[in-house]
Amino acid sequence: MLRAILDTNVILASLLSNRGASFEILQKLRRGEWRLVLSNHLLLEYEEVLKRNAPTLGMTFDDVDRYLNAISKAADCVELFAPQTPRLLDPDDEPLLRLAEASGARLITTHNLRHLRPAAAHGIAVLLPRDFLRIITQP
């Protein structure tokens, strides 16, 4: 089964609109059509961003906790250890690359290709949600 990492901006976009590729990607995750790869660090980032945006999303903190619990159940959790020297343009995105390397997931989906493009040098594909959706929709 395909395993991939979702940048926080994809999770947020999936909750802001039920019409885009990000929303469809999360629907397919819920149906078990692919596996999300998570680390504790990434899950905490999801939580921080979603709780900060909870009023805009029409969610309470309890709603966010329930949502993240459901996502966690559809994910493979991988523990990350000591940080390495940053290799990406935005050091805040470094845990995504480290997670991909540690988990064997070869795909990161994000709305911010520019910061993650150097991941390709490490054998990690970085795709926009619409491109990832095409992959997981193929028969």
Language model regions located:
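Short, active-site-adjacent cap segments at secondary-structure transitions
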Residues: 11-12, 44-45, 115-117
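Acidic, PIN/NYN-like endoribonuclease modules and their adjacent C-terminal/linker elements
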Residues: 94-97, 101-139
